[in-house]
Amino acid sequence: MKIAIAGGGIGGLISALMLRKKGYEVSLFEKRDRLGGRLAFTEEQGYRIDEGPTIVLLPEMLTSILNEAGISRDQYELININPLYKLHFKDGSSYTKYNSIERQIQEIKENFPGNEEGFVQFMKDMEIRFNLGKDQFLEKSFHDKRTFWTRNNLKTLVHLKAYKSVNNSLKAYFQDERIRQAYSLQTLYIGGNPLDSPALYSLISFSEHKHGIYYLKGGYASLVTVLENALLNSGVKVMKNATVERVVTEGEQAAALIVNGEEVKADAFVLNGDFPGASKMIPKESMPARNYTASSSCVLLYFGLDKVYRDSPVHQFFMGSNFQQHMKEIFETKEVPSDPSIYAFHPSVIDSSLAPEGHGVLYALVPVPSGSPINWGEQEGFVEKVIDQLEERGFPGLRKSIQWKKVRTPDDKEMEGLFQGGSFGIAPTLFQSGVFRPQVKPSKLTNVYAAGASIHPGGGIPIVMQGAKLMVSAILSDHQNKEREGVSLSG
């Protein structure tokens, strides 16, 4: 049985490896000259830094799925980050997150007294909800909608407080607004508004403490080389600079892909691209029309430095004076943030391979609106203000240390095919989560499947990998059912 995969992002790569292990003949088509999608490096003058994802979450899920795909633990190295990260507030206070719950309680007692009991209760409640959510949502596909609307699932949704926002749900645990920011900003990892995203996404901040934060040595994007080598060694046919233009259909099934103007036939097809765009390859009569809300975007600054800030944490957040105002500017008024929060990533503290000897790299991310009319080419002043904040609050002498600099904006992301320039797929709103999110079987076509950040269960590298795993299970199930009926998957 032949399977054609359109797109070489992480979802496409994991899908290809898993399907090949099951004995299928797999071809993968990638429009760019490299694989990996959002997992990529920016490299220049001997400096190398991750272009997109940097924080490795859910390490057990990541390693388990890689193992299922044939990637052994000795092919990559995960480094535990502890402290997890440090948050700096405009009033001069700070909050450091730790792996150790006991150390975290002490941190809260010392800096935000009165919130420690709430933290203990938060961790207890979230552990129960995490296990529920993992079992009922992360590990299940809802392409058959009936499997979602069960009494058990509805009870779980209520238990997960899906009807509340992340920010509002945290008011039951923390009196101090700064602590609530520290446990709600994680929705921005997947492009969601903490003031609006369902409370089930509070589980991200819980997971940081419970499962830890890790760094993949060499950079997160170094995983792509490992996966690509595995693809080639396993016999997957990989074609780069191969643009998939559309899906050719015959009745209720797909018959072929048009790739660089040529017809490529297969028995089943996988779409691995930002789904609002990828879905346009499917004829309208087979793909119900739908309006999507894009995730937030970001302005990214990459620096090559002539030094390493040895006392710096790997991850830091420099919070603005009004977090709620920043969120309003991103998600409602769609304007350039006036006093934004900034995430900084300085991996050279633990990885000397990213820059010339004695030098370092620095990455800064500012959440900004997607789908806005902002002319990012005219926002040099905004970039300079971000650099000023980094220098004043965390990296003294930064400007003098810069040897190389690069800036990426929502315009770059939109040019690369990301929906409205959003960085994380479609937004994790209530009605774009769970059963309401595009599923692994997203259309009326019985042999077309999908993987990626906009597909259930959502964004973030391990979660996209989990979505690919669910999608492969759907293909296997369909194939087995068809074999029992005595016909091939393509009829």
Curated annotation (Swiss-Prot):
Keywords attached to this entry: Carotenoid biosynthesis, Oxidoreductase
One of the protein's GO biological processes: carotenoid biosynthetic process
Pathway involvement of the protein, from the record: Carotenoid biosynthesis
Superkingdom, taxonomy of origin: Bacteria
Catalytic activity: all-trans-4,4'-diapolycopen-4-al + A + H2O = all-trans-4,4'-diapolycopen-4-oate + AH2 + H(+)
Gene3D superfamilies linked: FAD/NAD(P)-binding domain
InterPro entries, A to Z: Amino_oxidase (IPR002937), Carotenoid/retinoid_OxRdtase (IPR014105), FAD/NAD-bd_sf (IPR036188)
Active site per UniProt: 208
Pfam families xrefs: Amino_oxidase
EC number: 1.2.99.10
GO MF: oxidoreductase activity
Record function comment: Involved in the biosynthesis of the major C30 carotenoid methyl 4'-[6-O-(acylglycosyl)oxy]-4,4'-diapolycopen-4-oic acid via 4,4'-diapolycopen-4-oic acid intermediate. Catalyzes the oxidation of 4,4'-diapolycopen-4-al to yield 4,4'-diapolycopen-4-oic acid.
Family: Belongs to the carotenoid/retinoid oxidoreductase family. CrtN subfamily.
Identification of the protein by name: 4,4'-diapolycopen-4-al dehydrogenase
Annotated organism of origin: Metabacillus indicus
Name of the gene: crtNc
